[in-house]
UniProtKB/Swiss-Prot annotation:
GO cellular component: cytosol
Coiled coil: none
Any one Gene Ontology molecular-function term assigned to this protein's record: ATP binding
Keywords: ATP-binding, DNA damage, DNA repair, DNA-binding, Nucleotide-binding
Binding site for ATP: 618-625
Functional description taken from the UniProt entry: This protein is involved in the repair of mismatches in DNA. It is possible that it carries out the mismatch recognition step. This protein has a weak ATPase activity.
Keyword DNA-binding: yes
Identification of the protein by name: DNA mismatch repair protein MutS
Pfam families per the UniProt record, alphabetical: MutS_I, MutS_II, MutS_III, MutS_IV, MutS_V
Highest taxon listed in the record's lineage: Bacteria
Gene, per the UniProt record: mutS
Organism of this sequence: Hahella chejuensis (strain KCTC 2396)
Family per record: Belongs to the DNA mismatch repair MutS family.
Length: 860
């Protein structure tokens, strides 16, 4: 726009010149330019907004002889349009009229008051209630990536460093940022192609010196030594870029961001991008929330509890000590069903985490304060409920929850029970909270009554029957006397206007009232806004303990939720051990069990030094994938601190969970199904350790039989012999069932099925040893494959099983087009049936014919 501005600015009206000056500072963002009751957009902004919002594209004036494109949205409905644009990854600049149109000689003064971007949202209307909305900045040093993450709505700020593109992809999958900041020179932009809201920043946004200064200013420290980030240059640079961007968009110093937390990958069980996708932790394969692990496990009472639970599921702990803290808390909450009363109280708690962020940003709305008031008044009752708890961790949380009687009292006295949505139109503060505000409101609301009172009083004082009090816009308030009585006016009456048949006067009292009345409404609104801002300042003074309280309430909610889930879903507390083992008795898949109409069949699993790999065979649809996924889900839940779906679980240290499951092309990345499969396999073979859990499903199926078998064999052998990770290796290559003969730490298991009346019944039970067959043709039959194809497949199977090297061809292979439309020749049995005259057969002849046809069918 700067080139356009310099070329055409002199040709424009002063108003458009003002717009161009503002737009030049925000070239990559949509500028909402306030004009009266509308926000207008011009040029390319107008075209883009018209396309995205489906609004009318019109024009205003000309530029270089060409009409200027224009689109607009009503001021009162702008929030909805802004929300839609931000959800599409756009950033919106709000430019308001700040000058008085009546006093302006040129165009009304306008300035940018807000910049709304996908990653810096704090307004409740724009946010997903149960999901974090994150701004991520990435700095790159070759294969070392510095990551800084800001949850501006929740008040969390984290940094970390990861090495390698795979690790970066894993973190992107975990964080799912709403907006990503990278340098214009970032070398891995292809990795971000599937993410909206990618913003390229100038290289100087990532300068180390600037970053250090910004962060020290934010946290009011001389240096960053207390944040455990020594030597993390990449992360500090990312943090500096992030803070510079956030402060510019918010027009604020972000007072609710009080500390910087360093995340270490080694503190949590690492889930790579493929594992998060395949295990459907909080997003299913269709991109939805339903039928995910979080969907089953989240019955939290509060939105902030739901968000914390999702963070826990996506980042299971490595520390068994921390896990046991959570387990012990859940056990106590289950005693005498103590979680029930706690859950009911928590259901009345507002989203104080996000409310406090809006308070700090001075963007909290009246209903935010009403919800905060209701939350704070509940805290004493919550404390009483927690007095009986003995668990150390729960008592620590109770202490952090604390009570805030001063703020609760202030908000109870100040805020109406059901206040309006915005402070702009008043009516937020209670009657009696402020004497001056009450007086101003009274003047504004009761002006008519007051004038009648003055009129009555003056008539009694002067005994002048023609006296009346009136008002007009030109002369304001007045006392009017008829011409015959005007010479009897008291000495304190000051002549204001002479009419043909009357005289109008003003008194000092009426003049004082006039000054108050004419400005009372605007003064009342102004004073109410000032008092409202003072309330926000009072809350901000206790922001730190209030934020600690909100986080403690969130954790209390998650633990209470886990207790409810344990009871409702029949979950057990897993035993944690330092031994390398994973022992599950009666394990169940937490999601499949809830959505299936049939009773879920539980299964056992035993991995330890003796058997570190299971080769899993069995029919398609037999339950191999479910068995593998439920194992990973149980591990994740266990290390989140939750109880798990099983009869008994003993689990040792786990550092990573890997999955190679499913199949799909990466069309955007130009990778075939097999290439995706091999990339995921390579990642596992490079990064898995002896403490990892590895799920491998059908490795090698995307290529030729011999290539696939060779790769599957080599991968399984490498995992068993070199890495020795806990591995579940599902395959249809029955040759792999020979591995236990040469590798003592490998065992065979299979899922069972049985044939009954030419149909297949899946038993979904796991047994030792290899499967006897795959039942692939029976599954094809269940899927509705045409009978003639099934018959042909059965013939070819018999030939292959009898040792034939290839299917026998009765005729030269037809061309593809001929084959598509070829008529299937009837079998000998079908021919006999077509010629049969059923009505002419006796019962004995019919029975003999049936036996004959059966024999022909078996021999064909």
């Amino acid at each position: 726009m700067s080139a356009i501005e310099s070329a055409i600015k002199p040709q424009h009206t002063p108003m458009m010149q003002q717009y161009l000056g503002i737009k030049a500072k925000h070239p990559h963002q949509l500028v909402f330019y306030r004009m009266g009751d509308f926000y207008e957009l011009f040029y390319e902004d107008a075209r883009r907004a018209a396309e995205l919002l489906d609004i009318t594209l019109t024009q205003r004036g000309q530029s270089g002889g060409q009409p200027i494109p224009m689109a607009g949205v009503p001021f009162h409905a702008a929030e909805g349009y802004i929300g839609r644009l931000v959800r599409l990854g756009e950033s919106v600049v709000i430019c308001e009229q700040v000058g008085d149109p009546a006093a302006s000689k040129g165009p009304v003064e306008r300035k940018v008051v807000r910049v709304v971007t996908p990653g810096t949202l704090s307004d409740e209307a724009f946010l997903e209630e149960k999901s974090d909305n994150l701004l991520l900045a990435i700095s790159a040093y070759k294969d070392l990536f510095g990551l800084a993450t800001l949850d501006i709505a929740g008040g969390r700020f984290l940094i970390q460093e990861v090495r390698g593109v795979e690790a970066l992809a894993s973190e992107l999958q975990r964080l799912r940022p709403a907006e990503i900041l990278v340098s214009e020179q970032f070398p891995f932009l292809t990795l971000l192609e599937n993410y909206t809201g990618v913003q390229k920043q100038p290289p100087w946004y990532f300068e180390q010196e600037t970053a250090q200064r910004l962060l020290c200013q934010q946290f009011r420290t001389k240096d960053l030594a207390g944040f455990d980030c020594e030597g993390m240059s990449a992360a500090i640079e990312a943090a500096g870029c992030l803070f510079q961007y956030a402060q510019e968009t918010q027009r604020s110093q972000l007072p609710h961001i009080r500390t910087m937390i360093r995340e270490r990958r080694e503190d949590s069980i690492i889930l790579d991008a493929a594992s998060r996708r395949n295990l459907e932790i909080d997003v299913n394969l269709a991109g939805d929330y339903r039928h995910t692990l979080a969907w089953v496990m989240d019955k939290s009472a509060t939105a902030m509890g739901s968000r914390m639970l999702r963070r826990w599921l996506n980042r299971p702990l490595r520390s068994q000590e921390e896990v046991r803290q959570r387990q012990n808390a859940i056990k106590e909450l289950l005693e005498d069903y103590q979680f029930e009363a706690l859950h009911e109280t928590l259901k009345q708690i507002g989203d104080s985490e996000r409310i406090l962020s809006r308070v700090a940003l001075r963007s909290a709305r009246p209903r935010d304060l009403a919800r905060l008031r209701d939350t704070l008044t509940l805290l004493p009752d919550l404390q009483k409920q927690m007095e009986e708890l003995n668990d150390t961790h729960l008592r620590r949380l109770a202490k952090q929850v604390s009570e805030f009687p001063d703020i609760a009292d202030l908000l109870s006295r100040a805020i109406e029970e059901n206040p309006p949505v915005v402070i702009r139109d008043g009516g937020v503060l209670r009657q009696g909270f402020d004497e001056e505000l009450d007086e101003l409101r009274s003047i504004s609301e009761n002006a008519g009554d007051y004038l009648l009172e003055i009129e009555k009083r003056e008539k009694e004082r002067t005994q002048l029957s023609s006296l009346k009090v009136g008002y007009n816009r030109v002369h304001g308030y007045f006392i009017e006397l008829s011409r015959t009585q005007s010479d009897q006016a008291p000495a304190d009456y000051i002549r204001r206007q002479t009419l043909k048949n009357a005289e109008r006067f003003i008194t000092p009292e009426l003049k004082t009232f006039e000054d108050k009345a004419l400005s009372a409404k605007s003064r009342a609104l102004s004073r109410e806004k000032m008092l409202y801002d003072q309330i926000l300042e009072t809350i901000v003074e206790q922001l730190a303990p209030l934020q600690d309280s909100a986080r403690a309430l969130s954790e209390l909610d998650v633990l209470s939720n886990f207790a409810e889930r344990a009871l409702t879903l029949n979950l057990v507390c897993p035993d944690l051990t330092d031994e390398h083992m994973l022992h599950i008795e009666g394990g169940r898949h937490p999601v499949v069990e809830q959505v299936s109409q049939d009773p879920f069949v539980p299964n056992d699993l035993n991995l330890q030094d003796k058997h570190r790999m299971l080769i899993i065979t069995g029919p398609n649809m037999g339950g191999k994938s479910t068995y593998m996924r439920q194992t990973a889900c149980i591990v994740i839940l266990a290390y989140c601190g939750s109880f798990v779906p099983a009869a008994k679980v003993v689990i040792g240290p786990i550092d990573r969970v890997f999955t190679r499951m499913g199949s799909s092309d990466d069309i955007a990345g130009g990778r075939s199904t097999f290439m995706v499969e091999m990339t995921e396999t390579a990642n596992i073979l490079h990064y898995a350790t002896r403490q990892s859990l590895v799920l491998m499903d059908e490795v090698g199926r995307g290529t030729s039989t011999f290539d696939g078998l060779s790769l599957a064999w080599a991968c399984a052998e490498h995992l068993a012999r070199e890495i020795q990770a806990f591995t579940l290796f599902a395959t249809h290559y029955f040759e792999l069932t020979a591995l236990p003969k040469t590798h003592a730490n490998v065992a065979n298991v299979h899922l069972t099925a049985t044939e009954h009346n030419d149909s297949i019944v899946f038993l979904h039970t796991v047994h030792e040893g290899p499967a006897s067959k795959s039942y692939g043709i029976q599954v094809a039959q269940l899927a509705g494959v045409p009978p003639q194809v099934i018959n042909q497949a059965q013939k070819q199977l018999k030939q292959l099983e009898s040792g034939a090297s290839k299917p026998a061809l009765t005729a030269p292979a037809p061309s593809l087009q001929d084959d598509l439309f070829a008529r299937v020749e009837p079998s000998e049995v079908e021919t006999r049936l077509q010629k049969l005259d059923v009505d002419s057969l006796s019962p004995r002849e019919a029975l003999n014919m049936l036996y004959e046809l059966k024999t022909m069918s078996e021999n064909s």
